[in-house]
Regions:
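Cys-His-centered catalytic/binding microenvironment captured across papain-like cysteine peptidases
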Residues: 1-107, 114-160
């Protein structure tokens, strides 16, 4: 089989600014971020039909990593208490998974429920309807699993 090429959706100007165009959008019933009920949310990720062939073979995986842009996030923090909880340490934004980041890029590893054409259905994606999708990658334990990962004790207090 021959490689099928496509055009990049990103670019960088001479000043170093990066532009990224989404390859699709999320479609679900969530209108605003909510905690903690993400585990039951089913989302359709609708990919631009130009990239449908890029999904071929994804059905063989049980989980995918979704990269998306949190376009509805209105605040940018440098330090805070995660989830606004003062019983959690006051930490830097890069020491937590909160959405109030300088670059509103997010990633989530989720269960792949199925695929039909240019649409993949996933479960437990913490995303709002209409959120731009930047990339989809298969979850592969050989690359993504970290054995004996160390995390602070306060993480177990967070609501997921």
């Amino acid at each position: 089989m021959k490689t099928i090429f496509c055009e990049f959706l990103d670019s960088q100007d001479k000043n170093g600014a990066i532009k990224i165009k989404p390859l699709g959008k999320a479609k679900n019933s969530v209108t605003k971020p909510t905690l903690p009920d993400w585990k039951d949310v089913v989302t359709e990720i609708v990919i631009d039909k130009t990239y449908t062939k890029g999904l071929d073979g994804i059905e063989e995986y049980s989980h995918v990593i979704v990269v998306y842009w949190m376009d509805k996030e209105k605040e940018c923090h440098l330090k805070h208490h995660p989830q606004g909880r003062e019983d959690i340490p006051y930490i830097g934004i890069f020491a937590c998974r909160c959405p109030q980041r300088p670059n509103r890029i997010a990633i989530s590893t989720v269960e792949l429920v199925g695929r039909k054409g240019n649409i993949i259905t996933v479960k437990s994606l913490d995303i709002v309807n209409g959120t731009p999708i930047l990339d989809i990658k298969p979850y592969t334990p050989q690359y993504d699993e970290v054995k004996n990962a160390k995390v602070p004790g306060w993480v177990s207090k967070l609501v997921f």
